[in-house]
């Protein structure tokens, strides 16, 4: 089973059920493959705040793809080489941090899409192999197959969200609620369900809906997933690798003590 059997764009177009994916911070292709076989729909590799480097990510993307799931990559920064590199390695989607203006969103799309939508540099034979396509077929379909999300996580991004959402070639908006809540509270704290955070997220979701974009967010827990889903979010990260390990170990110890 290979990645080309999973049409991420078509799946995200069906917004009746949320697309839930795990979030990886640890560099392990073995663990990535195992997570991809859990009853969730995708795996995101965090190259911004995780400990995953690009050389790690290549094998991890392959492991996720071989399990028939889409590999999503949060790149380190909004830089053409980093975005193109992730897509060349076979990522089905990239999440780009700190996109704070229309101009930055346009630059992101140029990095992620081939002409006429952008100016992505050609190359990356791993992507052809991942999708099981000839180079010619990949070129024809890459702009549609690969998804690019702009992260909304600052006051500046929120102020410009309607302009960002209208950028041609953008596939979705992805809220970083921790950074956004820090920004909105002026550094007081992190609260992913505070009123000011949720009000801001409603604005982001409305901008996404107006432009037929996917609304995504880092949720983390079942309760927060339900809250965000009620506001129109359908692309959400829920299971973090470190949290899964801690929960599994804690459950085992508790079970032993309860016997």
Predicted features, each with a name:
Residues 1-259:
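Expand to "…catalyze enediolate/carbanion chemistry for C-C bond making/breaking, isomerization
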